[in-house]
Amino acid sequence: MLLFPGTFTMQTDYAELVRRTIRSVPDWPTPGVTFRDITPVLQDPRTFRVLIDLFVYRYMRQRLDLVAGVDARGFIVGAVLAHELNLGFVPVRKKGKLPYRTVAEEYSLEYGNAAVEMHTDSVRTGQRVLLVDDLIATGGTMLAAIKLLQRLGANVVEAAAIIDLPYLGGSAQITATGTPLYTVCQYQEGD
C-alpha cells in the first residue's frame, strides 16, 4: 500500500526522510572516504516502506517484466521492489557466485578488474528490465550490469539507485549510454 498520493512535494519530503536516515561514516573504508550506510533505512520499517514506495510509485505503470538487482545491497531493495510490483527478480552477481551457465561482464576498479555475471537464461530477448543498486559512485558496476543485460537481449528501461555521488562521475557515464537514471538521494562532495 502506497503511503503517499504522489505529489511532487510529498515525494521530495519522503526522499529527504530517506536521506536523513542514511548514516554517513567518515574515513571508512579508507581515510578521506565517507561511506553512505543504508542499514539505518533498512532497520526502520517506516523509512524502508517509504523508500520502497518511492520506487513503486515511479515504476508501477512502466510495464516492466523484471527487476534486476546488483550484488549485494541492490538485492535487498530490488527483491522487495520486484515483490511489490508482482515481478520476477534477477540477481546480477559477483563472478563465481552463480551455479548454472553464466555470462559475465568485466569492469575496471581503481586497482584492477572485477566482473559481474548472470545466468544465461535469466532474461529473454525484449524483456523490459529495471536495474537497481544501492549506490552509484564511479558507475563501473552499474555500467557492467547494463551491458550484461543488453547482451542477453533485455531492454533496460531505467537504472535506479538509492544514492548518487555525482561528483565521482558514475551517473553521467550511465546517462551517456542512453539509459535513463533515477536516484532518490544525491550527495555532493563534502556533504
Curated annotation (Swiss-Prot):
InterPro entries documented for this protein: Ade_phspho_trans, PRibTrfase_dom, PRTase-like, UPRTase/APRTase
Its localization reads: Cytoplasm
One MF annotation (Gene Ontology) recorded for this entry? AMP binding
Describe which pathway this protein belongs to, using the record's wording: Purine metabolism; AMP biosynthesis via salvage pathway; AMP from adenine: step 1/1
- List the GO cellular component terms: cytoplasm
E.C. number, please? 2.4.2.7
Subunit relationships: Homodimer.
Function recorded in the entry:
Catalyzes a salvage reaction resulting in the formation of AMP, that is energically less costly than de novo synthesis.
Quote the HAMAP family the UniProt record gives. Aden_phosphoribosyltr (MF_00004)
List the PANTHER family: ADENINE PHOSPHORIBOSYLTRANSFERASE (PTHR32315:SF3)
Q: NCBIfam families this protein is in?
A: apt (TIGR01090), PRK02304.1-3 (NF002634), PRK02304.1-5 (NF002636)
The text of the family note is: Belongs to the purine/pyrimidine phosphoribosyltransferase family.
Name of the protein: Adenine phosphoribosyltransferase
Give the gene that encodes this protein: apt
